[in-house]
């Protein structure tokens, strides 16, 4: 839509496996599931029918993809002097909506149109380079694992302040965080009763907060 800027598009999601998870007598079993893909839609064939009146199924999809430089406004990679900014949206498989008017709504995603989505609860873990800040829909559940002691103090101050408090200033952007050893940090977020979830990650982010 916005031009590839010389990037070779690899076709989108690479599906490694699709499995159905079942639990019998406390033991979890993963079974390979057959599936078919048509444009942006996947149909998964369950090994047995889903029971009515409250039946449920857990499906595990192992997939990967390369974020495009230009992602139709919702996703992309921006080059800055302090590092790349990655913005990620519509990046994971979604269930089609089942409603009492049309049944399954299986229209494909259509560019600039709005998406018809179910509400649900999300829990995500995002592993990024240790000098990145990751922002995401919802609530960060492990701030002590990803922010330095000083940043945690500033966040605590911001929760009580009507004025903006800098958590990570422009002068600190190039300073590596000492809060976690190793090359990466994992940020855990959760949100309840939401239509969707998106996130962004960069070493170039300046962060502030207030009550």
Language model features with spans:
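Hydrophobic helix-coil surface modules that form long, contiguous segments used
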Residues: 90-104, 110-211
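Surface-exposed, acidic/Ser/Thr-rich flexible loop segments
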Residues: 42, 48-133
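Proteins with a high burden of low-complexity, intrinsically disordered sequence enriched in S/T/G/P/A and R
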Residues: 1-7, 23-30, 54, 59, ...
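A surface-exposed beta-strand-loop module
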Residues: 2-83, 173-182, 186-187
């Amino acid at each position: 839509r916005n031009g590839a800027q010389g990037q070779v598009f690899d076709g989108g999601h690479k599906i490694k496996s699709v499995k159905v998870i079942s639990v019998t007598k406390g033991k979890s079993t993963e079974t390979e599931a057959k599936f078919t893909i048509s444009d942006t839609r996947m149909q998964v064939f369950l090994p047995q029918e889903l029971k009515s009146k409250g039946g449920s199924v857990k499906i595990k999809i192992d997939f990967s993809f390369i974020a495009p430089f230009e992602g139709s406004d919702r996703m992309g990679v921006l080059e800055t002097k302090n590092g790349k900014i990655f913005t990620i949206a519509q990046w994971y498989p979604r269930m089609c909506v089942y409603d009492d008017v049309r049944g399954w709504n299986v229209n494909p995603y259509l560019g600039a149109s709005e998406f018809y989505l179910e509400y649900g609860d999300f829990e995500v873990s995002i592993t990024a380079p240790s000098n990145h800040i990751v922002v995401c829909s919802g609530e960060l559940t492990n701030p002590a694992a990803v922010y330095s002691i000083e940043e945690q103090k500033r966040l605590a101050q911001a929760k009580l302040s009507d004025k903006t408090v800098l958590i990570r200033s422009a002068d600190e952007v190039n300073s590596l965080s000492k809060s976690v050893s190793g090359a990466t940090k994992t940020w855990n977020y959760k949100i309840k009763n939401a239509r969707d979830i998106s996130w962004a990650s960069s070493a170039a982010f300046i962060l502030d907060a207030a009550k």
